[in-house]
């Protein structure tokens, strides 16, 4: 019979499709940063430095957020390939060792996140003083909704609001924790250290919100093939929904999401798997990464996985002769006592 395809198993979809959605979210985030850097450089040359703190905070945060996501994602892909995932034939070990160092070079990720947190604390202080917050961080000053209006349709507007609520709440809690410690007599640096985990949570939520909101904005202004847009919309929705379910405690902590709404999210995720499945391979191929770069027996354009694994095994040095040399040097003497130099027991 026909061999079942790995992607038809829901457990594989649950692990791999959110990573596919993440790849698209990070792609759009990268495009945003490239444009922001180019425009920011021109403004700096003109002496316009107002947006520099926000650009620094966002770039530092995305460096950490994206490298964490990539390194964890490669490991999930490797596990999904079973034993072959640990072989160099899969190409995944090479990707893993090239991605993981990004978590520490050019700034260890925790330090990068705390730089974001420092900027967010300044924004929160400005909000308390009645100052207008710039650009993307303006959500911190918005009047928070106590309950989500999300229904089974899971509109992008409701999903983004959920991420805004989570980030704003975590920022406020971190700021109040620091203020409480300082008022209790702790020096500022000590209060910062004792609040650093909450500060990290706040910065991470801020970066996650950016990736979701930026992805949504790109999808909503996209034009062209309607069917392609529908698929991209499903990918974006999966990224948003899965992100909430993976960090559910931070979304239901203060009762913002109800049990019924969580049920909507779970059912939607499984439905989105069905929508994305027929297009999953095409969505990966759209990145147009050639086989020569991937060097993978598993992730191949022609799909000839078994033949590729066989050919890879034939190239191994130990498989260059029909009988390995160790047979003549070690095994055959043991099997022929008359010519053996080994002592008899």
Segments and roles (model prediction):
Residues 1-345:
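Flavin-dependent oxidoreductase catalytic core characteristic
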